Amino acid sequence: MRARTVLAGLTLTLLATGCAPWHDDDGPEHGRDGLGQTHLVSAARGDRDAASLTVVSGATTLAVRAADLGDDLYRISTPDNSGIAPDVVESGGRFQLHLRSTGDNGPAAVEILLDRRVRWDLRFSGGANETLVDLGGGRVAGLDFTAGSSRIETILPKPEGPVTVRMAGGASELLVRAPEGIPVRVTAGGGAANVTVDGNRRSGIAGGTVFAPPGWDSAADRYDVDAVAGVSTLTITRP
C-alpha cells in the first residue's frame, strides 16, 4: 500500500538565519496574503544534479515529496490563510528553510516539493508531531532526523551507493519503506520496544543492537538505518 498519497496537504516548518531570503516573485498577487506575505517560494534548478536542504525549526506536521517540477529546484507552500509563510536562504552550500508569522490564525501547514532529478541530502532539525518524507520517485544522498518526532515515515528510492538514514532525536514510531531487493541494516543505538524488519518482529531491543541481512557489507547499493536515539516502534518494510 503506497503511503505517498497521504502526503499532499501535510506540513513542515523551517528556520534559517544569517542570509538573505530567496523569494519567488512571479507577481504581486501570486500566493500572497493581505499582509504581502508570499505563501509560495521556488528557485530555478539550473544545471544542479545534487542539492542539500536543512529544515531547522519545528512544526505540527512536515511533508516532503519528490516531484516533476519542470525548471524548478523546489517549491515550498503554505495555505493562503496560514499563520506562517516560507522564506528560503542559502548558507554554506545548503539551502535552509524559514517560516515567519503572518499574523493569521490558519493552519501551520507546509508542503515541500523537491525536483525528482536532483540527488537530495536532507536534514531535519526542528522536530514535528508527524514527519512524512516521500522520495520514492526521486533520488537521495542521505536523511538525517536530528530532532524528535512522534511519527516519522519515509519512502526511499533505489539508492546510489551506500545511503544512511539517521534518527537522532527520538520517535514513537519510525517507519522506513525501502525498495524490494535492497539490503537494509538497522542499528537500534538507543534501544527500541519493538523492531520489525521485513516482517520479522522482535521486542525489548537493547541499545546498540544491530540487524544486518546477509550480503549487506558487500552490496554496492544499500541503506543503513541508524536509530541513534530511542524509539518505541521501528519498522522496515517494502512498498
Across the structure, where does each feature detected by a protein language model lie?
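Bacterial N-terminal signal peptides that target proteins for export
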Residues: 1-7
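Hydrophobic helical h-region of N-terminal Sec-dependent signal peptides
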Residues: 8-12
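C-terminal motif of bacterial Sec signal peptides marking the signal peptidase cleavage site
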Residues: 15-18
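Bacterial signal peptide processing site
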Residues: 20-23
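Extracytoplasmic low-complexity, Pro/Thr/Ser/Ala/Gly-rich segments
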Residues: 25-87, 233, 239
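Short, surface-exposed interaction patches in beta-rich subdomains
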Residues: 38-46, 77-79, 88, 94, ...
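Extracytoplasmic
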Residues: 48-50, 59, 69-71, 83, ...
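Extended beta-solenoid/beta-helix repeat architectures
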Residues: 115-119, 125-128, 134-149, 156-162, ...
